[in-house]
Amino acid sequence: MNFARDFVDAAPPDRLALVGVAEDRRRQELSFGAVAERSARLAGTLAARGAGRGDVVMTLVGNRPDWVHAMVACWRLGAVALPCTLQLRSADLRRRMERVEPRLVVCDEHHLDSVAATGFGGPVLSVPDERHYESAPAPPAELGPEDPALVVFTSGTSGEPKPVLHGQRYLAGQRLQAEHWFGARPGDLCWCTAASGWSKSARNAFVAPWVRGAAALLVEGRFEPERRLDTVERERVDVLCMAPTEYRAVAKLAALRPLSSLRHAVAAGEPLDADVTCLWQETAGVAVHDGYGQTETGALCGMPIGPPVRPGSMGKPLPGIDLWIDDGEICVDPATVPTFFLDPPDGPWRTGDRATEDEDGYLWFEGRSDDVIISAGYRIGPVEVESALSTHPAVAETAAVAAPDEVRGAVVRAVVVLRPGHEPSEALARELQEHARAETAPYKYPRIVEFASELPKTASGKIRRATLRDGSAV
């Protein structure tokens, strides 16, 4: 097997594969034939610089076609792609290099200094540079499902980022979620907005669309809510994949409106508030299908395509995946997950994430095992509190954590970022408490409300609850 051969070379050469939109809105379209040729020639250049089967190639390239060419070139050779987000600093890159020892680096023109500052002594290929696409095309290596293909680092929500190694089967295995959750169809244009460098982008930016015969949209530039909607309309996007934070921001800060081209939308990476799901369905005309997975596992469950969406739920296990709840924790049988990382554990994989399952088999996320708040014997998921507070018009973003309490053991502490036009006050804090009591069970309301200008987050945008718990963020 070889992803480059099986899904790029084998596709109709005239079929649209990629649409790239630069920050200045310059536009580039590439067919599968063009991607096959350019990635094969780039693979020839990588091979000439010493990269081969099993070698790690680090990429530090933004959401542009050059990044896709580099990833596919690695897989053509049987090399291991290590995509890195552009937000990483030299110290972050150096730590990754020390862990996985890349043979060479493919870097865009804006981040050469960051790579140089690491002291990396191997070859560095700067893109765009047409000379790298002039080598003789490299033939696809014959690979097995367990041959390594991709190494990604966990986001470090609860500790130092660690590498996770995936095999060739991870790439072809994306067909499961692409069909049953992501929802790509032949001829679609799919836009996964995740930045290059994360596991979500590695599987959904172009792999998931391609295994279903669809095209992928790559857009450079910072997140701007109104521009996000403009791009969906201008490019006639069929399938949209965004982080819940982005869906919330677009709903609250942009002029959300009917999006006639958009047939399907998915969210993953953190829980999606029920009110945001409803707002998108009512205003944009599309139901957002939440999903769940991990860096180690790939997608595990998602809101099914077809039945009505259940706002607030992350759906059901994908077909064939054996997933269950044990003492409140999500567990899975690695043997049933086609995208599980190499060298799986003996026995079940305990995710460390907590959820409940209703009588219809739908899963409802509660939080990380160490995020669940135990107050006076009540088990409170932070997402429940956050969802309640997020429906208040003054709230832009919020996070709930436990705070020590002599009587109750712990109480709920909410840290709130306000929308423009609202100022922190004791009166507003009391108003938010009463709002939460009205929106959810009274025992869940935050007995402590604090205001902050922003929430501490990892480079991938996840809230650092541990930082909030120790009080250093406010």
What would you call each of these model-derived segments?
Residues 36-44, 145, 164-185, 193-194, ...:
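Conserved structural elements of the adenylate-forming
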Residues 172-192, 196-239, 252-253:
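Conserved AMP-binding/adenylation subdomain of ANL enzymes
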Residues 237-242, 251-309, 322:
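Gly/Ser/Thr-rich phosphate-binding loop
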Residues 28-33, 149-173:
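Conserved AMP-binding A3 loop
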Residues 14, 18-64, 68-72, 89-94, ...:
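Conserved AMP-binding/adenylate-forming core of the ANL superfamily
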Residues 13-16, 136-153, 160, 183-189:
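Conserved pre-ATP/AMP-binding loop-to-beta segment of ANL
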Residues 22-24, 28, 104-146, 160:
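ANL superfamily adenylate-forming
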Residues 88, 240, 325, 334, ...:
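AMP-binding/adenylate-forming catalytic core of the ANL superfamily
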